[in-house]
């Protein structure tokens, strides 16, 4: 199965990039990771979320759930095991998308600081498909600020903290009520973020234990 949004890829022109991936929303998902926007495709090693080989998201999940940071790494290759990642996320109820549906890159890199949001994601349309959602998780400043504005949360949570979500996104009809849900802000899995791998694992483990127990 392909997770590429070929229609969006085809219409990405004139400096505007539309999201190249379809939302990954497994049935019964309790956690929704929302980043800012994927890196350029030249940096991908898999056609899925957190596709950059030097981003440690899948190594962190490997360490948290299997005690092995290389659990999702293809031995001898610089890519991740996509089928195992998808199966794992479906079993655990972990969904993925981003807070922007279209962006303009102001510099030729993957930094959130140089992303201009052209079209924010319709968060209500996502959460309405996830009635069992217990936590929205962000790992970057831009994504956190965007989701706080969408949810009407006045104070942006600090890294390694969470706030209660008092109401679902505006425009939501049915589906997710937002009741009892939390917005968690975790440290970025990018190696550019100045925190040890072990400390990141500890932070992610705390969130997963709290939400999935």
Residue ranges and their predicted role:
Residues 30-31, 135:
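Structural motif
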Residues 24, 86-89, 128-129:
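Short, conserved, surface-exposed binding loops centered on an aromatic residue
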Residues 1-23, 27-28, 39-41, 51-53, ...:
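C-terminal capping/extension of enzyme domains
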Residues 42-115:
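Short, surface-exposed acidic-centric catalytic microdomains
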Residues 70-71, 133-134, 155:
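Short secondary-structure capping/junction motifs at helix and strand boundaries
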Residues 36-37, 138-143, 188:
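Short, well-ordered beta-to-alpha junction loops that form the rim of enzyme active sites
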Residues 32-34, 94-98, 183-184:
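Short hydrophobic-aromatic micro-motifs
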């Amino acid at each position: 199965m392909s997770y590429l949004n070929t229609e969006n890829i085809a219409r990405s022109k004139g400096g505007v990039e539309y999201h190249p991936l379809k939302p990954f929303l497994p049935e019964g998902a309790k956690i929704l990771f929302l980043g800012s926007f994927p890196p350029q495709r030249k940096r991908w090693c898999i056609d899925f979320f957190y596709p950059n080989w030097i981003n440690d998201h899948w190594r962190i999940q490997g360490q948290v759930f299997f005690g092995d940071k290389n659990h999702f790494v293809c031995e001898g290759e610089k890519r991740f095991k996509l089928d195992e990642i998808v199966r794992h996320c479906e079993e655990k109820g972990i969904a993925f998308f981003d807070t922007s549906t279209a962006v303009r890159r102001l510099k030729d890199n993957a930094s959130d600081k140089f992303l201009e949001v052209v079209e924010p994601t319709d968060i209500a349309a996502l959460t309405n498909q996830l009635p069992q959602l217990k936590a929205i998780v962000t790992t970057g400043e831009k994504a956190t600020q965007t989701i706080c504005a969408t949810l009407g949360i006045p104070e942006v949570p600090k890294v390694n903290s969470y706030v209660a979500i008092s109401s679902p996104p505006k425009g939501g009809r049915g589906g997710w009520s937002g009741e009892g849900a939390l917005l968690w802000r975790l440290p970025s899995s990018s190696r550019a973020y100045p925190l040890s791998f072990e400390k990141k694992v500890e932070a992610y483990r705390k969130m997963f234990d709290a939400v999935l127990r």
